[in-house]
């Protein structure tokens, strides 16, 4: 049985991007519905993140539109603090997602987006008809585990994606290999080490390592100075803090951290103590994995190591291509990412938008939400809402 539902704007995804977009539309009195496949909003934060997680950027760079963090909130907000903030945000702006909705298909027909959704609670098919559709599932739709010879068919230990990792308590005394040296990888490696696991970390590429304070200084200065000048200052501060990290297998890219982010989309890694553990020898840096047999991992440099568990902090991928049958909005590529780079990534044709795909973190989500709401408002009401949404 199918249930037909008509709405002006359909938002797919109830993470920060979906909540922010709905909130901006609600402030303009534009009808919208948010559908979410999970049982809660912000499920990546509530159900798929590790316990010690904090926002890696200062709070002023992470707040959503129209609701700054309270002045007594710590500069770097904890996981629980951010979850509470998101829940309060949804309540304040009357965002009420429909949970347990799994989008099966979406296509454009006769001036409307037709979106078929399975209500996992009732098993009914809901068919939404919307003039505008916002893909707000973001860049972190699904965890990625690379294909490694022997991993699936031979490995005798346990392997998991970083989204399944909570803390290192059950890994105490175990030999654990962390794959990936981004923020999740470095922080999980540090957490494991502090829980008395024997930790190695795979560093497959060049990486900038900075502190939260250095990043905060850099982001503040970018408002006034060229990116290359800010990069030089941040690298000087990083050199004073860490000295020569290449001695420990952490080689910096040729471009500075902020320029590298603009070019590659890859952020600097924020150190929470992992570099100190690496310098002391408590965490060993290793090269890329070549193959796995039993519990033995062979690396591309010929070295081997026996491990009990592997944690893959190897990132995420978009899930848009699974349900967007034909991109009649000319917005997404075959990998479910926008065809156009930031800042032109958020708007397609035929009323299709993307929120949270600009590789700009939470600050980018806020910009996307405001841009989308203003654009829809101008198309529906023929008015400028710039002032109303800039507060």
Swiss-Prot record:
GO biological process: auxin biosynthetic process; response to ethylene
Lineage, highest ranks first: Eukaryota, Viridiplantae, Streptophyta, Embryophyta, Tracheophyta
Pathway(s) this gene product operates in, as recorded in its UniProt entry: Plant hormone metabolism; auxin biosynthesis
Positions that bind FAD: 13-18
Sample GO molecular function, one term: NADP binding
Function: Involved in auxin biosynthesis.
Protein residues bound to NADP(+): 180-185
The entry's keywords: Auxin biosynthesis, FAD, Flavoprotein, Monooxygenase, NADP, Oxidoreductase
Enzyme Commission number(s): 1.14.13.168
Organism annotation: Arabidopsis thaliana
Catalytic activity: indole-3-pyruvate + NADPH + O2 + H(+) = (indol-3-yl)acetate + CO2 + NADP(+) + H2O
Entry protein name: Probable indole-3-pyruvate monooxygenase YUCCA11
Name of the gene encoding the protein in the UniProt record: YUC11
Pfam family, one: FMO-like
Induction text: Up-regulated by drought.
Cofactor: FAD
Annotated family: Belongs to the FMO family.
């Amino acid at each position: 049985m199918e249930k037909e539902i008509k709405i002006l704007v359909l938002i797919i995804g109830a993470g920060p991007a979906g909540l922010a977009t709905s909130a901006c539309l609600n402030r303009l009195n534009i009808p919208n519905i948010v559908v979410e496949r999970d049982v809660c909003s912000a499920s990546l934060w509530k159900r798929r993140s590790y316990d010690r997680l904090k926002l890696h950027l200062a709070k002023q760079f992470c707040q959503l539109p129209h609701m700054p963090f309270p002045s007594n909130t710590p500069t770097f907000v904890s996981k629980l603090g951010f979850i509470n903030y998101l829940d309060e945000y949804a309540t304040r702006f009357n965002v009420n997602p429909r949970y347990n909705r799994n989008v099966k298909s979406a296509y454009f027909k006769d001036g409307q987006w037709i979106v078929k959704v399975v209500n996992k609670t009732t098993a009914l098919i809901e068919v939404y008809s919307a003039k505008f559709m916002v893909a707000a599932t973001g860049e972190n739709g699904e965890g990625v585990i690379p294909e490694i010879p022997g991993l699936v068919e031979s490995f005798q230990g346990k392997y998991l994606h970083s989204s399944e990792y909570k803390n290192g308590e059950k890994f105490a005394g175990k030999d654990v290999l962390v794959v990936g040296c981004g923020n999740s990888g470095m922080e999980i490696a540090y957490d494991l080490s502090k829980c008395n696991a024997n930790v190695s970390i795979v560093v497959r590429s060049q990486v900038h390592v900075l502190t939260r304070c250095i990043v905060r200084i850099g982001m503040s200065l970018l408002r006034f100075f060229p990116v290359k000048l800010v990069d030089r200052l941040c690298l000087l501060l990083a050199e004073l803090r860490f000295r020569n990290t290449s001695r420990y297998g952490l080689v910096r890219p040729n471009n500075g951290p902020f320029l590298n982010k603009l070019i590659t989309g890859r952020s600097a890694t924020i150190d929470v103590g992992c570099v100190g553990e690496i310098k002391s020898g408590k965490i060993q840096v290793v090269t890329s994995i070549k193959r796995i047999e039993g519990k033995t991992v062979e690396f591309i440099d010929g070295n081997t190591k026996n491990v009990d568990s592997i944690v893959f902090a190897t990132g995420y991928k978009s899930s848009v291509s699974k349900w967007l049958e034909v991109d009649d909005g000319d917005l997404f590529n075959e990998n479910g990412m926008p065809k156009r780079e930031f800042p032109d990534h958020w708007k397609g044709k035929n009323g299709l938008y993307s929120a949270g795909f600009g590789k700009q973190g939470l600050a980018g989500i806020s910009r996307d939400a405001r841009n989308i709401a203003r654009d829809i408002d101008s198309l529906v009401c023929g008015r400028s809402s710039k002032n109303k949404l800039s507060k």
